Swiss-Prot record:
GO molecular function, one term: ubiquitin-like ligase-substrate adaptor activity
Main location: nucleus
Pfam families: Det1 (PF09737)
One Gene Ontology term from the biological process aspect of the record: positive regulation of proteasomal ubiquitin-dependent protein catabolic process
Protein's UniProt name: DET1 homolog
Function as written in the Swiss-Prot or TrEMBL entry: Component of the E3 ubiquitin ligase DCX DET1-COP1 complex, which is required for ubiquitination and subsequent degradation of target proteins. The complex is involved in JUN ubiquitination and degradation.
Species of origin: Homo sapiens (Human)
Domain of life: Eukaryota
Tissues expressing the protein: Highly expressed in the ovary, some lymphoid organs and resting leukocytes.
The family this protein is said to belong to: Belongs to the DET1 family.
A GO-annotated cellular component: Cul4-RING E3 ubiquitin ligase complex
Compartmental location: Nucleus
Subunit structure: Component of the DCX DET1-COP1 ubiquitin ligase complex at least composed of RBX1, DET1, DDB1, CUL4A and COP1.
InterPro entries: De-etiolated_protein_1_Det1
Length: 550
């Protein structure tokens, strides 16, 4: 045996040169069906390699890019108007940065640095329209926006607190027998949903929900699938379904809750004539209805039939044992799986009204067909079957491929590295103190239902292209804890450091007693990102862009 021959061969790193990759693409067609993957690799050569710290911006709250990358929306400082900007491209400020070397333009006081920070925003974003949206004391929710599939319109939400005096009438608060009891943690408000044309800045349509509770933050209470918009009224336990037209108007489709069909009131009136009489005279009090709401009734019927199909007396006894608890369940969250199916999360009223924040509370997931008004399936929040469906078909829950024919959703069902992260998280919970398999399932299913348009499609967050610490930044568009060091992005194929993103200010003493949050907004496909660090009431905006340091 020759001991001089090494048995461990060093890993060969593929050529990272962009010229080499372009030439290889020219002479090699690659495997069938891999064209888009080969093109996407070029993002490892063109990336946001330069950060400008503390960019001056107009007095507004930055929100996000449209899915086609053409527009950027922001909310005015008084949260009554929507500001629509046109994005000018990642090269828009290259002449301003000419001659700058390195990776960071820090918060310096020299004249050129101050000039760059003051002009950078207007170079990248040109203001097109300012649309006055909220009226009657309402304020736009800074974390609520939904873009239509054609990127022509955007839907935003506003709310106004109800005054303590005069108090709303009792039957305005409780409009049916499923209505929940409001409390200071979950106060009632007046809500409005507005749809604005991005091209013209015109306010096209508005829908109002008086004396209600709709969770606007992070789009939790509303969901847009293609042209179908669903809105969950937590207070009235009702789901309102609209169709969004290409012209930007809302068309009433159906209301699900007390009734499932639009003509159910006629059926009830045939049996209870006083219901029809009270409705015509305006004296109807659905809160005192003696019968179970239609949607809840369909849920109970499904569970009873499942107990009958089980064939055992124990299954029926368990149904009777928990019947009262099942009747007290309330809708908390929902999402559209497609144009016809709703995915609804039920839990106790204390959780829905935020009296209890214990995540271990029992809950149920219901799949409901809006057209046939049938409950298709019911899962507990400890269901291994639902977890398997979620892990294998995560993209269908995210609806990640609606805006483009070619997208690369970075989820556990379509990305090996995302799957590894999820398995590592699952194993951590299983092995933790007071953990276990059931607790891990409950924690993973706690992500459902998934809010609409809450994941970034940026290639720089694709775990198959880049490796980064998802503790500081991830594809899910939620604020993260701001770290003390830059976020490093390594090429997945070579392991080489490609670029760093620095959030917050540099050179300032760090107070670890104050929680610092940072929100990232990535362009859908260009090497450009915005980070907004919030510490108490202070906002620091950094731009991360492509800069040729020559």
């Amino acid at each position: 045996m020759d001991h001089h021959v090494s048995t461990i061969k060093p890993r060969r790193i593929q050529n990272q040169n962009v010229i080499h990759r372009l030439e290889r693409r020219r002479i090699s067609s690659g495997k069938a069906g891999t064209h888009w993957h080969q093109v996407r690799v070029f993002h490892q050569n063109v990336f946001p390699n330069f950060t400008v710290v503390n960019v001056e911006k107009p007095p507004c709250f930055l929100r996000k890019f449209s899915p086609d990358g053409r527009y950027f929306i922001a909310f005015s400082s008084d949260q009554t108007s929507l500001e629509i900007y046109e994005y000018q491209g990642c090269q828009a400020a290259e002449d301003l940065l000419q001659g700058y070397e390195g990776e960071i333009l820090s918060n310096g006081n020299d004249q050129r640095s101050v000039n760059i920070r003051g002009r950078l925003f207007e170079r990248f974003f040109v203001l097109l329209h300012i649309t006055n949206v909220a009226a009657n004391g309402e304020h736009l929710n800074r974390e609520c926006s939904l873009f239509t599939d054609d990127c022509r319109c955007v839907i935003v939400g506003s709310a106004a607190y109800l005054p303590d005096e005069p108090h709303p009438p009792f039957f305005e608060v409780y409009r049916n027998s499923e209505s929940v009891t409001p409390n200071p943690r979950s106060p009632l408000e007046d809500y409005s949903l507005h749809i604005i044309d991005l091209h013209t800045g015109r306010l096209c349509d508005t829908r109002t929900f008086k004396c209600d509770k709709v969770v606007l933050s992070h789009n939790q209470g509303l969901y847009l699938y293609k042209n179908i918009l669903a809105i969950l009224s937590v207070q009235q336990q009702t789901i309102h379904v609209f169709q969004v037209t290409p012209e930007g108007t809302f068309i009433d489709v159906r209301t699900i809750g007390r009734f499932c069909y639009e003509d159910d009131l006629l059926t009830v009136s045939a049996v209870f004539p006083e219901v029809q009489r009270d409705s015509q005279t305006g004296m109807a009090n659905p809160f005192r209805d003696p019968f179970i709401n239609s949607l809840k009734h369909r849920l109970l019927v499904y569970l009873w039939r499942r107990a009958e199909q089980d064939g055992s007396a124990m299954a029926k006894r368990r149904f009777f044992q928990y019947f009262d608890q099942l009747r007290q369940l309330r809708m908390w969250k929902m999402q559209l799986l497609d144009e016809n199916h709703l995915f609804i999360k039920y839990t106790s009223e204390d959780v829905v009204t935020l009296r209890v924040t214990d995540p271990s509370q029992a809950s149920f997931f219901v799949v409901y067909n809006m057209v046939t008004t049938e409950v298709i399936a019911v899962f507990e929040n400890t269901s291994d079957e639902l977890l398997e469906l979620f892990e294998n078909f995560c993209d269908l829950f995210r609806n990640a491929t609606l805006h483009s024919e070619v997208q690369f959703p970075c989820s556990a069902s379509s990305n090996n590295f995302a799957r590894q992260i999820q398995r590592r998280f699952k194993d951590t919970i299983i092995n933790a103190k007071y953990g276990g398999h059931t607790e891990a399932v409950r924690r993973l299913l706690g992500q459902l239902p998934i809010s609409a348009q809450s994941y970034s499609g940026s290639p720089y967050l694709d775990l198959s292209l880049f490796s980064y610490d998802d503790k500081w930044v991830s594809v899910m568009e939620r604020p993260k804890t701001c770290g003390d060091h830059p976020i490093r992005f390594y090429a997945r194929d070579s392991g080489l450091l490609k670029f760093e993103i620095q959030a917050g200010l540099l050179g300032r003493p760090i107070n670890h007693t104050v929680r610092r949050l940072v929100a990232f907004t990535f362009h859908p496909f260009e090497p450009f990102a915005i980070s907004v660090q919030r510490t108490n009431a202070e906002y620091v905006v950094n731009f991360h862009m492509r800069h040729c340091c020559t």
